[in-house]
């Protein structure tokens, strides 16, 4: 399993605009083969939001980024002024996972 993170530096005062954009998103990724989950993390002490997507494998993620659904989901990008810096994109392979035991 892999986790793809996209850290987005949101300009001060534009947090609501950023969050509303995700509330109204097209919800197309959920139907992609290999997709597991999406998480959007609000910062507590910084201005970087983090969008995490979990995938069965890198090939599934790459297929998403090359799909017509991806293009549709990203066609109404927010205005550049909503961001105060470049985004930081990373991909990680999960090598260990733990959850609370029932």
Predicted regions span which residues?
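Short, well-ordered beta-strand segments in beta-rich or mixed alpha/beta enzyme
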Residues: 2-8, 39-67
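Short amphipathic alpha-helical/adjacent loop interface patches that line ligand
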Residues: 22, 26
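Compositionally biased, intrinsically disordered low-complexity segments
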Residues: 6, 13, 32, 97-98
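An amphipathic, aromatic/His-enriched active-site/gating alpha helix that lines ligand/cofactor pockets
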Residues: 27-36, 54-88
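Residue-level signal for secondary-structure boundary sites
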Residues: 16, 59-61, 97
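Short, surface-exposed ligand-recognition loops at beta-strand->loop->(often short) alpha-helix junctions
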Residues: 10-19
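Glycine-rich beta-strand-turn "strand-cap" elements at beta-sheet edges
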Residues: 2, 39-46, 75-102
């Amino acid at each position: 399993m892999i986790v793809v993170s996209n850290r987005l530096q949101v300009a001060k005062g534009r947090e609501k605009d950023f969050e509303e954009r995700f509330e109204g998103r097209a919800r197309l990724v959920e139907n992609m083969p290999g997709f597991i989950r999406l998480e959007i993390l609000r910062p507590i002490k910084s201005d970087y939001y983090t969008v995490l997507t979990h995938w069965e494998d890198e090939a599934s993620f790459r297929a998403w980024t090359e799909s017509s659904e991806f293009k549709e989901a990203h066609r109404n990008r927010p205005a550049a002024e909503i961001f105060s810096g470049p985004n930081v994109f990373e991909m990680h392979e999960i090598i260990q996972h733990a959850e609370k035991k029932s």
